[in-house]
Amino acid sequence: MRESIKVLQECAEIQDKKSRDYQNENSRIRQADYYPRGIMSIMELINTKTIRLWSVLEAMENDPNYAPNFESIEDSLKDLINYSSFAVAYSRGKIDGQDPDRDFLNRKKPSTVKEIRDAEGQ
């Protein structure tokens, strides 16, 4: 098996384990609640994680003795893989708790011909 496939399997396992904490059955919180701006909220998470990763990598590049305190480079990269999978799932309308009457940016979808025409600028 290719190593990249193994990495994806590891990411799926991490996602499954973390989801038990973030969307546990004893809470009313659903995954979609974390993304009030839809895919834009997920992109903000990706951006934040990427900036943190750049910061750590630059520190490691400039100081051979530097090591991250809490999260390894591999952990951060796996988080990015999982966040990307959330973005794809959200764009498909398949995130737990996602409102089917809202689009991938969490905007209300037009429901009438007039609303559709107004949305298209006609």
Walk through the language-model features, giving the residues of each.
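Intrinsically disordered, low-complexity regulatory regions
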Residues: M1-Q122
